[in-house]
């Protein structure tokens, strides 16, 4: 397949922010795509080469890409850097530069999607002393034969700056339309994706074997399952209204959610965002098999840092020390953990997803022995507000954040958020009754002591129905100097030339970011806003919701994907809850 077809499609997609138009462009692209190439196209659309859990990263720096452009075009590095500074996008700069190309290539090889993909894959696999030279050689070979537009998108893929604003849901909509003619069939694709975490594979099977084969997707050991997510509630009373008379309550621990795939002595660990994190937890790899009484199993747990002397739970941030590349053995000793199990997804070759919560819990307790390192998260069956309050108090005294509430008869809904799981967190005195996990979508340059960093951030909630991120506040308090330095390092590579199509904000930021980083904030209250877009028109016509006096808690939720952020429905629930509290107080 000619790469020019893909480049033209990318160019159209970059020019619109409308989801329907993006979907239509994708449908047109998929219909032009040969069956054997469809998986590669889907991966490239996502800005990757393989599914996340395989950990294939291109690792190409801007300086290396600039050298490759210079080698291919014959134009000095300084001039390329000047063009880059004008627009802030190396892909766009390459288009301009290569139109002025002074070098002539006599033997031009066709640029195909297959060639580009295979070359990028070779680049991703290169290691060792000569790897940088080889990377430049491969990049230059592509740029030599590419048109300026093709080169632009090759570089954007290489640098991780392809900003099409296309979410996975939009890709699945387009696949369903292109290969079945019915958007409703997205549900079948979604199930396959939720159990495989590999959208490229789903697309390939759909294109080559049809929808009936996609329906046969099952859990594969050592491929992560997309996690089930929870809504939030503000009070015990609200929980009972949503869940009925009898349900389970578990401690909500402040740790890292881990999915454990185990067969014999082989253990692979995945994060909430499907990253392979086995290297961060050699202690889990070593100790967990001894507790398992099954041939193979997939479990979910919270890895929680503890004070080894007292056994008390420590904050999530303590686990970040384990994410360093080196000296992991030292970090394991300095920052010990316990593994706190809460679900079983697969056992002895069979899926447990369809089992009710109560059955899954009983099975988990039966096949996993507890010891000092591996625990079952404390659970109780609750029937009324007093039961919840008592267990909630126990959980807080034990060092947890609150409770997870789960209906007893619910299956495990991979990749879904719904009312079968609810979270009830501890109150913040004199503040909004819960923290919020918000997506960083924009930044404002700092002044005074904060010069050189982003002094204030623009944050957003996730709007599930529209698959967008809606502005809810600016936050500039709660940041230490170290936080600001770290945020600058994390956010700078995510700067985009224009606002991502999935961002819904009337407020203009100094810079826009790819919506990826999630941070935790608290606030004094939620108010109506004529400016912010969160829950716009849901409470009052022409008004959205905003946070009053928001403050960063110090927690960067690096384990969360942007789509795991607090939703507008959650914010509406919190807003209505605070209004009810105010009303109740007025009656006292």
From Swiss-Prot:
Instruction: List the residue ranges forming a coiled coil, or say none.
Output: none
User: Superkingdom of the source?
Assistant: Archaea
Catalytic residue positions: 252
Locate the residues binding ATP: 250, 257, 272, 302, 342, 417, 423
Its recorded name reads: DNA ligase
Question: Which GO MF terms does the UniProt record name?
Answer: ATP binding; DNA binding; DNA ligase (ATP) activity; metal ion binding
What function does the entry list? DNA ligase that seals nicks in double-stranded DNA during DNA replication, DNA recombination and DNA repair.
What's the EC number here?
Answer: 6.5.1.1
Which GO annotations describe the biological process of this protein? cell division; DNA biosynthetic process; DNA recombination; DNA repair; lagging strand elongation
The Swiss-Prot or TrEMBL record lists the needed cofactor(s) as: Mg(2+)
UniProt record similarity statement: Belongs to the ATP-dependent DNA ligase family.
Q: Which UniProt keywords apply?
A: ATP-binding, Cell cycle, Cell division, DNA damage, DNA recombination, DNA repair, DNA replication, Ligase, Magnesium, Metal-binding, Nucleotide-binding
Question: Reaction catalysed by this chain?
Answer: ATP + (deoxyribonucleotide)n-3'-hydroxyl + 5'-phospho-(deoxyribonucleotide)m = (deoxyribonucleotide)n+m + AMP + diphosphate
Keyword field contains DNA damage: yes
Q: InterPro entries given for it?
A: ATP-dep_DNA_ligase, DNA_ligae_ATP-dep_bac/arc, DNA_ligase_ATP-dep, DNA_ligase_ATP-dep_C, DNA_ligase_ATP-dep_cent, DNA_ligase_ATP-dep_CS, DNA_ligase_ATP-dep_N, DNA_ligase_N_sf
Any Pfam family matching the protein: DNA_ligase_A_C
């Amino acid at each position: 397949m000619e790469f020019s077809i893909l480049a033209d499609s990318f160019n159209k997609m970059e020019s619109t922010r409308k989801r329907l138009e993006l979907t239509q462009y994708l449908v047109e692209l998929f219909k032009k795509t040969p069956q054997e190439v469809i998986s590669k196209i889907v991966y490239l659309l996502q800005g990757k080469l393989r599914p996340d859990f395989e950990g294939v990263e291109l690792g190409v720096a801007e300086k290396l890409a600039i050298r490759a452009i210079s080698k291919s075009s014959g134009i000095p590095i300084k001039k390329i850097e000047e063009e880059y500074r004008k627009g802030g996008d190396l892909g766009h700069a390459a288009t301009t530069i290569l139109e002025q190309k002074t070098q002539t290539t006599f033997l031009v090889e066709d640029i195909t999607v297959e060639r580009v993909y295979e070359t990028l894959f070779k680049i991703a696999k290169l290691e060792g002393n000569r790897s940088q030279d080889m990377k430049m050689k491969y990049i230059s070979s592509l740029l030599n034969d590419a048109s300026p537009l093709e080169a632009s998108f090759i570089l954007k893929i290489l640098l991780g700056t392809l900003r099409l604003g296309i979410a996975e849901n939009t890709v699945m909509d387009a696949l369903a339309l292109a290969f079945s003619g019915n958007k409703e069939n997205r549900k079948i694709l979604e199930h396959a994706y939720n159990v495989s975490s590999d959208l490229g594979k789903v697309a390939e099977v759909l294109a080559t074997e049809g929808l009936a084969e996609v329906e046969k997707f099952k859990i594969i050991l050592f491929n992560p399952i997309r996690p089930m997510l929870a809504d939030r509630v503000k009070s015990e009373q609200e929980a009972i209204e949503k869940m009925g008379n009898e349900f389970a309550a578990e401690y909500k621990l402040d740790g890292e959610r881990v999915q454990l795939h185990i067969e014999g002595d082989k253990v692979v660990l995945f994060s909430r965002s499907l990253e392979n994190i086995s290297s961060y937890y050699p202690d889990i790899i070593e100790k967990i098999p001894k507790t398992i009484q099954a041939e193979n199993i997939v479990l979910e747990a919270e890895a929680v840092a503890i004070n080894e002397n007292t056994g008390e739970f420590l904050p999530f941030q303590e686990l970040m020390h384990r994410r360093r590349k080196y000296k992991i053995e030292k970090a394991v000793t300095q920052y010990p953990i316990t593994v706190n199990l809460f679900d079983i997804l697969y056992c002895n070759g069979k899926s447990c997803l369809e089992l009710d919560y109560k059955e899954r819990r009983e099975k988990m307790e039966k096949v996993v022995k507890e010891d000092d390192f591996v625990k079952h998260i404390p659970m109780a069956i609750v029937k009324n507000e007093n039961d919840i309050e008592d267990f909630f108090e126990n959980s807080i005294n034990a060092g947890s954040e609150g409770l997870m509430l789960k209906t007893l008869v619910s299956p495990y809904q991979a990749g879904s958020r719904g009312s079968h799981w609810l979270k009830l967190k501890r109150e913040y005195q004199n503040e909004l009754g819960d923290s919020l996990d918000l997506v960083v979508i924009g930044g404002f340059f700092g002044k005074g002591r904060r010069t050189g960093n982003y002094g204030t951030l623009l944050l957003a909630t996730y709007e599930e129905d529209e698959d967008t991120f809606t502005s809810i506040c600016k936050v500039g308090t709660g940041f230490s100097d170290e936080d600001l330095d770290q945020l600058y390092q994390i956010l700078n590579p995510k700067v985009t030339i224009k606002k991502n199509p999935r961002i819904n904000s009337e407020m203009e930021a100094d810079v826009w970011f790819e919506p990826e980083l999630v941070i935790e904030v608290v606030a004094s209250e939620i108010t109506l806003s004529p400016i912010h877009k969160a829950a716009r028109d849901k409470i009052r016509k022409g008004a959205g919701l905003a946070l009053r006096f928001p403050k960063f808690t110090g927690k960067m939720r690096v384990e969360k994907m942007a789509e795991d952020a607090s939703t507008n429905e959650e914010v509406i629930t919190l807003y209505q809850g605070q209004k009810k509290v105010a009303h109740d107080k007025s009656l006292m």
